[in-house]
A protein has these predicted regions:
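Short, well-ordered secondary-structure micro-motifs
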Residues: 1, 34-36, 61-63, 87-91
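Glycine/proline-rich, positively charged
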Residues: 1-56
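Residue-level marker for well-ordered alpha-helical positions
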Residues: 4-8, 60-63, 119, 134
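A general structural detector for well-ordered alpha-helical segments in enzyme core domains, enriched
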Residues: 6-10, 35-39, 65, 117, ...
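Histidine/acidic residue-rich metal-binding segments in metalloenzymes
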Residues: 11, 61-72
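Glycine/Thr-rich phosphate-binding loops of Rossmann-like dinucleotide-binding domains
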Residues: 32, 60, 159
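Active-site glycine- and acidic-residue-rich loops that bind
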Residues: 54-63, 125-131
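Structured C-terminal cap/extension of enzyme domains
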Residues: 67-202
Length: 202
């Protein structure tokens, strides 16, 4: 997606009304920050959207593409705002993941560490009357070019798991205005800071 030939071809699709939106969604892994910044700088004038991984517990490295997106007029759609389901608040320490669940390949103890962080940011959610997933969505949307969030919806195993319908209702009740102060956004970022957790790609 940093190839001029690719973007010339993509632009021709838009010119022929075969699409009304152009964008990129690198992945499924994280860390394509350098390539994305280069792409925004070279082709931002023909790009509408880009999808990145961003959430309160994974601010890095996605946060570094945001200034380039803002500068070049690229709208950002953020996925995995729920941090592997933990921010839906029904994945707790000792949680049993179903066989084949991709989250079982994460480092041991990731749920425990995430739940510790949840308790540190819960007072901010409580102050504003937000659930944890609503707080995560508001945090993402507080960043300039972010215009949409895409949580993952998984029916978790176990008797205490929230039904997917309840998770959808929770998301539908997200306030239209952002309730977080700049100080609260930064406090959450510091609590969730994951700087250097992977090698950057590109």
């Amino acid at each position: 997606y940093t190839s001029e030939d690719v973007w010339n071809a993509m632009s021709s699709l838009a010119e022929k009304d075969l699409t009304d939106q152009l964008g990129i969604a690198p992945g499924p892994a994280n860390g394509f920050t350098l390539d994305m910044i280069e792409c925004f700088e070279k082709f931002g004038d023909v790009m509408d959207w880009a999808m990145i991984i961003l959430n309160p517990f994974e601010p890095w490295p996605g946060q570094h593409v945001l200034p380039a997106a803002q500068k070049n007029g690229v709208k950002i759609l953020t996925r995995v705002v729920d941090y592997g389901g933990v921010l839906h608040d029904d994945v707790k320490p000792g949680h049993h993941f179903r066989d084949g669940d991709h989250r079982t390949y994460r480092p041991e103890g990731w749920v425990d560490h995430a739940c510790e962080k949840i308790e540190k940011i819960r007072p901010i959610a409580d102050k504003h009357g937000l659930s944890m997933i609503q707080l995560a969505c508001q945090w993402n949307l507080a960043h300039g070019p972010v215009e949409s969030v895409v949580p993952t919806l998984i029916q978790e195993a176990g008797p205490d798991a929230k039904p997917i319908e309840d998770k959808l209702d929770d998301l539908a009740a997200l306030p239209g205005e952002n309730l977080l102060s700049a100080e609260e956004v930064e406090t959450i970022r510091k609590i969730g800071d994951n700087t250097g957790c992977m090698a950057l790609k590109g």
